[in-house]
Amino acid sequence: MAKVTPFLMFSDQLEAAIEFYVATFPDSEVRALARTGEDGPVRSAEFVVGGQLFLGYNGGSYFSFSEGVSLYVDCADQEEVDEYWDKLVAAGATPTQCGWIKDPFGLTWQIVPRRFTELIGDSDPKKVKAVMDAMMTMVKLDVAALERAYDEA
């Protein structure tokens, strides 16, 4: 059976991105790097982030990421949301809205507490709407505020 592996095309910052991702997320490692020449920049790589295998390539300045593709980080709780969010911001990431943040390499991440997914899975549409409305006002997701919106609906 064929296996699907995300292939990330960076303009020229593949090695720096991999170093950051491996240092930031557990269960991460560099598996292979291919350089342009013996001491040249990394051309391609195989790496694991959070247990997920990725392939990467430095493809030149005409390649860039968009929000059309993002990496979703399923966080156990608010503490984990804060940990990853803070690491991304400290590295120069740009927070956007609704738990989304663009890293310094242009890749967009969704840092989402598992509780959010549980709350929007409720069978009561009023509660789901209240949680979604609250989420739409947030930059970094806040579990306590989401639960408050749910409880007050």
Identify the function of each model-found stretch.
Residues 24, 29, 53-55, 107-115:
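Active-site-proximal beta-strands of protease catalytic cores
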Residues 18, 44, 48-50, 57, ...:
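Serine endopeptidase catalytic core focused on the charge-relay Asp
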Residues 61-62, 115-118:
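A short acidic/small-residue loop/turn micro-motif
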Residues 127-153:
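Acidic/histidine-enriched, glycine/proline-rich intrinsically disordered or flexible terminal extensions
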